[in-house]
């Protein structure tokens, strides 16, 4: 199902002049010693990028969507993706894929419109609607910062505040991520490299005493653990590309602790309600899939049709 996903985030030299996030720029240390933390109840919902290399747009939608700037709204994945191609280091726009750095530069210079002004379809020819540029001008980030990949406490500290942005080298074993979402590091590295991919870092947990980072993917709810997966910190540090660590975006609207807590509780309830609905839908789809598999006269063809319609672009 996932082998046809486009993996085309290009590898670029690391810019040692990128600004690093400093400890004092993220206020509180409360929570960094937690065994497990996840922003999946706060982030925009899992979607499926479909057949084009728009993972930078989709992961950016999750990252920027988990800020006060877009509270109650959703950024346009297509805008982030297309503007990234304008501001990345590669000439022209007649290609699929871009870089997080290009997308960040686009967010600083041109902002990002709401999803309704450039709705997502899995086509390079998707058109923005009238008013998109004017809407985007309201949503510009101030800056972006790299967090050194070995500074686990600072990454955790940043994750307690917002989702982070990163890209990595995908190996073939990734296609077979189990429902637990936990990627086997040894099997992963033993399989071949198949391309670059951008994702949103959303949390962490410890498994048998080892730190694993949590990520939201853009391949639909059937991938991994309801669209999320976990990489051992040492594996992440080995396959990370283009930056020395995950990217933290600095937005114009900063939260005080009380306001953040109010928003967090509201978003958690909204996400809980949505997830309950998604789980019901998923169970229904699994039941349909199970029934289709028992019918020998339609076999795999029916399963393929089911996968296309029920796990396609949302």
Regions found by a protein language model. Give the residues of each.
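Membrane-penetrating hydrophobic segments
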Residues: 280-298
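Long, well-ordered hydrophobic secondary-structure segments characteristic of membrane-embedded
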Residues: 54, 58-61
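Juxtamembrane boundary at the C-terminal end of a transmembrane helix
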Residues: 306-314
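Core hydrophobic alpha-helical membrane-spanning segments
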Residues: 299-307
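Active-site-adjacent structural segments surrounding the nucleophilic cysteine of cysteine proteases
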Residues: 1-53, 68-90, 112-129
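Predominantly the structural core of cysteine protease catalytic domains
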Residues: 2-10, 61-65, 86-216, 221-279
């Amino acid at each position: 199902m996932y082998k046809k996903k486009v993996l085309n985030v290009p590898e670029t030299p690391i810019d040692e002049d990128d600004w690093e996030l400093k400890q004092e720029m993220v206020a509180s240390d409360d929570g960094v010693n937690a065994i497990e933390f996840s922003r999946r109840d706060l982030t925009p919902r899992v979607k499926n990028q479909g057949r084009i290399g728009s993972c930078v747009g989709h992961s950016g939608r999750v990252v920027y969507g988990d800020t006060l700037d877009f509270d109650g709204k959703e950024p346009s994945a297509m805008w982030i993706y297309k503007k990234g191609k304008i501001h990345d280091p590669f000439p022209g726009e007649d290609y699929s894929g871009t870089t997080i750095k290009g997308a960040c530069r686009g967010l600083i210079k041109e902002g990002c419109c709401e999803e309704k002004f450039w709705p997502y379809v899995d086509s390079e020819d998707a058109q923005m609607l009238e008013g998109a540029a004017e809407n985007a001008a309201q949503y510009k980030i101030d800056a972006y910062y790299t967090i050194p990949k070995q500074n686990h406490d600072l990454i955790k500290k940043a994750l307690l505040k917002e989702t982070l942005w990163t890209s990595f080298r995908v190996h073939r074993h990734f296609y077979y991520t189990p429902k637990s979402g936990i990627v086997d590091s040894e099997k992963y590295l033993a399989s071949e490299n198949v391309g670059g991919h951008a994702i949103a870092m959303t949390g962490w947990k410890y498994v048998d005493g080892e730190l694993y980072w949590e990520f939201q993917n853009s391949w639909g709810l059937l991938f991994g653990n309801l669209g999320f997966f976990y990489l051992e910190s040492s594996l992440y540090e080995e396959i990370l590309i283009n930056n020395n660590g995950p990217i933290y975006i600095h937005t114009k609207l900063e939260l005080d602790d009380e306001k953040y807590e109010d928003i967090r509780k509201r978003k958690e309830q909204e996400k809980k309600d949505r997830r309950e609905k998604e789980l019901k839908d998923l169970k229904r789809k699994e039941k349909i899939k199970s029934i289709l598999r028992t019918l020998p006269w339609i076999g795999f063809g029916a399963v393929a049709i089911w996968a296309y319609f029920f796990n396609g672009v949302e």
